[in-house]
């Protein structure tokens, strides 16, 4: 006679449950990717697991308004609001890209009350790599 195998729950259900319970995150890394068209703010723990993220597009900005400093400020405040509730006190900031939202996002992060260990610019710079596209003629 075979024993019935108990189903504890699928892997997917367990993952959702672990995401819902707000585990305490004292320290994290805030990644700001600022392009000319959009600004994406991702908050991870020190191991690199994504805790929260937001972008100007998810905050309701559409078209050219996504690249504005105000949209970046709103996206940063939106991403940080959830991790402050989970107890984040210290963070490192990595800023990537040439966009207008760089400074506005950093200002919003400073205003949130999280202590910043350091702010690092991680924009990739080529050591004369690929040939750039030809200049636009308007």
UniProtKB/Swiss-Prot annotation:
One Pfam entry name: Ribosomal_S11
Skewed-composition ranges (Basic residues): 9-21
GO BP of this protein: translation
Alphabetic keyword roster: Chloroplast, Plastid, Ribonucleoprotein, Ribosomal protein, RNA-binding, rRNA-binding
Segments of this protein annotated with the region Disordered: 1-21
One annotated Gene Ontology cellular component of this protein: ribosome
InterPro entries: Ribosomal_uS11, Ribosomal_uS11_bac-type, Ribosomal_uS11_CS, Ribosomal_uS11_sf
Location(s) in or outside the cell: Plastid, Chloroplast
GO molecular function terms listed in the Swiss-Prot or TrEMBL record: rRNA binding; structural constituent of ribosome
PROSITE patterns on file: RIBOSOMAL_S11
Subunit structure: Part of the 30S ribosomal subunit.
NCBIfam families named in the record: PRK05309.1 (NF003698), uS11_bact (TIGR03632)
Family label: Belongs to the universal ribosomal protein uS11 family.
PANTHER family: 40S RIBOSOMAL PROTEIN S14/30S RIBOSOMAL PROTEIN S11
Protein name: Small ribosomal subunit protein uS11c
Originating species: Ceratophyllum demersum
């Amino acid at each position: 006679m075979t024993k019935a195998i108990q189903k504890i729950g699928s892997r997917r259900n367990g993952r959702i449950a672990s995401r819902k319970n707000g585990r305490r995150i004292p320290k994290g890394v805030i990644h700001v990717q600022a392009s000319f068209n959009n600004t994406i703010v991702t908050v991870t723990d020190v191991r690199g697991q994504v805790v929260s993220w937001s972008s100007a597009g998810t905050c309701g900005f559409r078209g050219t308004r996504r690249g504005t400093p105000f949209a970046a400020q709103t996206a940063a405040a939106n991403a940080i609001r959830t991790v402050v509730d989970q107890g984040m006190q210290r963070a490192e900031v990595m800023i990537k890209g040439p966009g207008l939202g760089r400074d506005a996002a950093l200002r919003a992060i400073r205003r949130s009350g999280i202590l910043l260990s350091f702010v690092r610019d991680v924009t990739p710079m080529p050591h004369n790599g690929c040939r750039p596209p030809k200049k636009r003629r308007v």
